[in-house]
């Protein structure tokens, strides 16, 4: 199947192409990737996408799916967490539980300035509208993630983004290139039902706050419990935006959740 389209994809070769040429090449591959199961996609990516691989996780509501899916095929794959210092206590507990139960190779990255130092310098950025939120995200998520990808020499970045999660993710492809790195989304076409059945089949758990009515979990100060009439994306960043910058190109907004 995909052997007819690509063997080992050389990132440097693709980066030498124009954006239009890259799009055509990636579109050909994505057509065939859409026909594979998530497990088959992961296997293909590990075999055919060059360089070091890593998976990012915010250890959110459905994080166990991607962490299990990828680590079962490459046990030592680095799991990158950007710790803002403002995660829920339940999130830190969930990180410890999954790291132990799945034997994860966890790599934690943080901002160069501590949370308290940032508040002293800039105030509570998340209370300063879109500009404040974007600066906060750039300091605490974007820069630490870029540093992680560079230090770990990552060429292929796995993420658990799904099209169903928000309007901004509805058109995401399985394979893309973002800021000079392969981005691979093996469960991008999964529904909430698919996620639920996978968790149940493999004896995995949702984030503890799922039982308390949270659909999406990030920092304590920019996460809301779901209320009737709200979409999932409206439970984050006061409904002002869905993405936090991690999954956006440099020429887009500075500052997307995982």
From Swiss-Prot:
Cellular localization per UniProt: Cytoplasm
Top-level taxon of origin: Bacteria
Disulfide bridges in this chain: none
Record bears the keyword Flavoprotein: no
Catalyzed chemical reaction(s): [thioredoxin]-disulfide + sulfite + adenosine 3',5'-bisphosphate + 2 H(+) = [thioredoxin]-dithiol + 3'-phosphoadenylyl sulfate
CDD domains hit by this protein: PAPS_reductase
GO biological process: one example: sulfate assimilation, phosphoadenylyl sulfate reduction by phosphoadenylyl-sulfate reductase (thioredoxin)
Pfam families per the UniProt record, alphabetical: PAPS_reduct
Enzyme kind, highest EC tier: oxidoreductase
Any one GO cellular component localisation term in the record: cytoplasm
Positions annotated as active site in the UniProt record: 244
A GO MF term: phosphoadenylyl-sulfate reductase (thioredoxin) activity
Alphabetized InterPro entries for the sequence: PAPS/APS_Rdtase, PAPS_reduct_dom, PAPS_reductase_CysH, Rossmann-like_a/b/a_fold
Subcellular location, principal: cytoplasm
Pathway info: Sulfur metabolism; hydrogen sulfide biosynthesis; sulfite from sulfate: step 3/3
E.C. code: 1.8.4.8
This protein's UniProt keywords: Cytoplasm, Oxidoreductase
Family membership noted in the UniProt record: Belongs to the PAPS reductase family. CysH subfamily.
Role noted for this protein: Catalyzes the formation of sulfite from phosphoadenosine 5'-phosphosulfate (PAPS) using thioredoxin as an electron donor.
Protein name: Phosphoadenosine 5'-phosphosulfate reductase
């Amino acid at each position: 199947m995909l052997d007819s389209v690509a063997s080992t994809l050389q990132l440097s070769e693709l980066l030498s192409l124009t954006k239009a040429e890259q799009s055509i090449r990636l579109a050909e591959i994505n057509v065939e990737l859409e026909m594979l199961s998530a497990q088959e996609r992961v296997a293909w990516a590990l075999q055919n996408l060059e360089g070091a691989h890593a998976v990012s996780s915010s250890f959110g509501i459905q994080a166990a799916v991607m962490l299990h899916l990828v680590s079962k095929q490459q046990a030592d794959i680095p799991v990158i967490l950007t710790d803002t210092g403002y995660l829920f206590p339940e999130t830190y507990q969930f990180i410890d539980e999954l790291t132990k139960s799945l034997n994860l190779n966890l790599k934690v990255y943080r901002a160069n300035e501590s949370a308290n130092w940032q508040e002293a310098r800039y105030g509570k950025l998340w209370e300063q509208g879109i500009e404040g939120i974007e600066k906060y995200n750039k300091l605490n998520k974007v820069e630490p993630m870029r540093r992680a990808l560079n230090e770990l020499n990552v060429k292929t970045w796995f993420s658990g983004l799904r099209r169903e999660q928000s309007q901004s993710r509805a058109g995401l492809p399985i394979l893309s290139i973002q800021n000079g790195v392969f981005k691979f989304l093996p469960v991008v076409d999964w529904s909430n039902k698919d996620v639920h059945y996978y968790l149940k089949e493999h004896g995995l758990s949702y984030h503890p706050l799922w039982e308390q009515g949270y659909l999406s979990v990030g920092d304590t100060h920019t996460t809301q419990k779901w209320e009737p009439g709200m979409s999932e994306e409206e439970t984050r960043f006061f409904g002002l935006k869905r993405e936090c910058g991690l999954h956006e190109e440099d020429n887009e907004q500075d500052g997307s959740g995982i």
